[in-house]
Amino acid sequence: MLNSFKLSLQYILPKLWLTRLAGWGASKRAGWLTKLVIDLFVKYYKVDMKEAQKPDTASYRTFNEFFVRPLRDEVRPIDTDPNVLVMPADGVISQLGKIEEDKILQAKGHNYSLEALLAGNYLMADLFRNGTFVTTYLSPRDYHRVHMPCNGILREMIYVPGDLFSVNHLTAQNVPNLFARNERVICLFDTEFGPMAQILVGATIVGSIETVWAGTITPPREGIIKRWTWPAGENDGSVALLKGQEMGRFKLGSTVINLFAPGKVNLVEQLESLSVTKIGQPLAVSTETFVTPDAEPAPLPAEEIEAEHDASPLVDDKKDQV
């Protein structure tokens, strides 16, 4: 009965206005009130502040600053094996496995369309048909920066407007096509393991989605699909990220979906639905063998992006809308 009530609220509540209100409140500097809210949040969700670079909650001027708090470098070591792809986020695995032609498993008895997830982009979908996927859910207590599973060259980013349903286990099991309905940012990379998509999915109360190369992607929520492209390789204007490097962040909890091309990687056998994930731990292994490179993988970045700063895109000249 309680679950039915919670699901009904997902359809009834004004999710967009709630999200805007939450984003507005989380960006305000309110002194002792901000600290009180953070302390209550830490206690309720059992947040481990010992892992944070700033464990003192009084250090955060806004709730958003606290929410995207950086971790100490040593608490998330990155697996250095060049054949291993690592987990992109702290959280739990919602689902993982093989993409069956165009079908991705959302929950037991519920599939959704790969092409719908990719906003109808059939050319991009063709890269991943019969490939592999991993869906990682970030709860409110988790670290909310998202990192690279492997070295990658950014080729395309698509912002897709959509609903703002919660993305917890209850909604995943009961809301059809949840991840293909919600607002999301699709990032396509060239990697040593073939093409890889890393998709940041929005949800109720998620105030914004950001990337390290373009700053805040949403808000504003303009209701139109936007697309950006970048050149390959070492060409001028290209964006290269290293394994373990931060690529984006959420302000409040959400979901990351990774897509891998067919025949390129095998997921770690021990992983299953509800497995706990930690950034830097093994997620998948290449089907080929690579020689260990001289360069070390990037540690967790120490440099901060201001929590309330809406950075201008670094590649405005590459932007076009569709």
UniProtKB/Swiss-Prot annotation:
Highest taxon listed in the record's lineage: Bacteria
Comp. bias (Basic and acidic residues):
308-322
Q: What is annotated as the active site?
A: D90 (charge relay system), H147 (charge relay system), S254 (charge relay system), S254 (schiff-base intermediate with substrate)
EC top class, as a word: lyase
Query: What does the entry say about activity and pH?
Result: Optimum pH is 6.5-7.5.
**Needed cofactors:** pyruvate
Q: How does it sit in the membrane?
A: Peripheral membrane protein
Inhibition and activation profile = Inhibited by ionic detergents such as Barlox-12, an amine oxide, and sodium dodecyl sulfate.
> Its GO biological process terms?
phosphatidylethanolamine biosynthetic process; protein autoprocessing; zymogen activation
Q: Name one Pfam family in it.
A: PS_Dcarbxylase
Give GO terms: molecular function aspect only: phosphatidylserine decarboxylase activity; protein homodimerization activity
Give a yes or no for keyword Nucleus in this entry: no
Q: Which reaction does it catalyse?
A: a 1,2-diacyl-sn-glycero-3-phospho-L-serine + H(+) = a 1,2-diacyl-sn-glycero-3-phosphoethanolamine + CO2
Q: What are the protein's UniProt keywords?
A: Cell membrane, Decarboxylase, Formylation, Lipid biosynthesis, Lipid metabolism, Lyase, Membrane, Phospholipid biosynthesis, Phospholipid metabolism, Pyruvate, Zymogen
What does this protein's UniProt record list under function? Catalyzes the formation of phosphatidylethanolamine (PtdEtn) from phosphatidylserine (PtdSer). Only decarboxylates the lipid-linked form of the serine moiety, and not serine alone or derivatives like phosphoserine or glycerophosphoserine.
Q: Which HAMAP family match?
A: PS_decarb_PSD_B_type1
What protein name does the entry list? Phosphatidylserine decarboxylase proenzyme
